[in-house]
């Protein structure tokens, strides 16, 4: 068994370090044996039998992200669970926004039989993107709550293969009223490196067509009489502009980018027929 010393560098990746890292060595062609360890956020030493491996590393103990398919490099993926427990009709089909996920994947790494420890310097990459937006809405005085979701962004991430995919589950987010606008912040997994649109997964989870998916923001306005009015905004063309600018030079959160709707598409919440009791 050979010693492998892993050093993790977080410079330029994040200031908020995760709790720790899980590293899995998957043997290729039956050479070697699967090794699965939890390391500190700075890394650590692992004992790995000589052989050829595919490797993944990611931060564990995330709040909303779960892992499935961890039996192989090809199948391991991150996803988020359904929004049960919100008590709002329709949200149980939605999934939570992912929290921070940092990932490294190596297709092939050869571990030789050696007395000397092999040193590996790794830098993980963030695979969750932040988005925000503001949009003007008329009639907000009739609204008691707003449920938001985005359809068509990546709701899962293939850690070994290194790309996000959409299984057509809407990602839920909270929407707040701010004067005559509504404002929201949400996250989704990164798409594949070379594509700006997510890969679509078929129901059988096998055939994958990399077709352009429409990306839609859906806002559901719950009114004072408990009726619901829905507005859909197609953001396929502008999704890149909604990527969160983050914190400005003055240390303040940048204001969310405004979505300019054409005059015919302005969102207006109709006055409820019944006065609230």
Model-predicted regions and their roles:
Residues 95-183:
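A sequence/structural signal for flexible, mid-protein segments enriched
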Residues 2-6, 21, 51-53, 129-131:
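Short structural boundary motif marking the start of a folded domain
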Residues 22-71, 144-235:
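Tryptophan-paired
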Residues 203-277:
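Hydrophilic extracytoplasmic domains
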Residues 33-126:
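Short, low-hydrophobicity acidic/polar segments
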Residues 7-18, 134-142:
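Structural motif
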Residues 109-116, 178, 192-194, 238-245:
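Solvent-exposed, conformationally flexible loop/turn segments
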Residues 1-13, 268-275:
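Bacterial Sec-dependent N-terminal signal peptides
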């Amino acid at each position: 068994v050979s010693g492998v010393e892993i050093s993790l560098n977080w410079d330029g990746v994040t200031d908020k370090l995760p709790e720790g890292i899980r590293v899995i060595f998957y043997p290729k062609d039956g050479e070697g044996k699967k090794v699965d360890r939890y390391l500190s956020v700075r890394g650590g030493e692992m004992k790995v039998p000589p052989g050829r491996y595919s490797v993944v590393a990611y931060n564990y103990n995330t709040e909303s992200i779960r892992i499935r398919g961890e039996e192989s490099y090809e199948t391991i993926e991150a996803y988020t669970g359904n929004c049960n427990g919100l008590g709002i009709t329709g949200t149980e089909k939605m999934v939570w926004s992912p929290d921070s996920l940092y990932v490294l994947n190596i297709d092939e790494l050869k571990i030789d039989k050696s007395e000397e420890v092999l040193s590996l310097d790794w830098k993980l990459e963030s695979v969750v993107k932040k988005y925000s937006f503001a949009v003007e809405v008329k009639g907000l005085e009739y609204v008691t709550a707003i449920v938001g979701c985005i359809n068509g962004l990546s709701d899962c991430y293939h850690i070994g293969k290194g790309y996000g995919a959409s299984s057509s589950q809407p990602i839920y987010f909270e929407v707040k009223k701010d004067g005559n606008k509504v404002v929201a912040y949400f996250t989704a997994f990164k798409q594949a490196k070379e594509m700006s649109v997510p890969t679509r997964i078929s129901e059988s989870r096998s055939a994958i067509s990399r077709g352009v998916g429409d990306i839609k923001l859906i806002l559901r306005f719950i009114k004072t009489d408990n009726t619901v009015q829905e507005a859909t905004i197609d953001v396929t063309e502008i999704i890149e502009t909604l990527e969160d600018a983050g914190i400005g030079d003055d240390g303040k959160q940048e204001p969310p980018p405004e979505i300019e709707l054409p005059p015919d598409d302005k969102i207006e919440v109709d006055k409820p027929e019944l006065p609230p009791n």
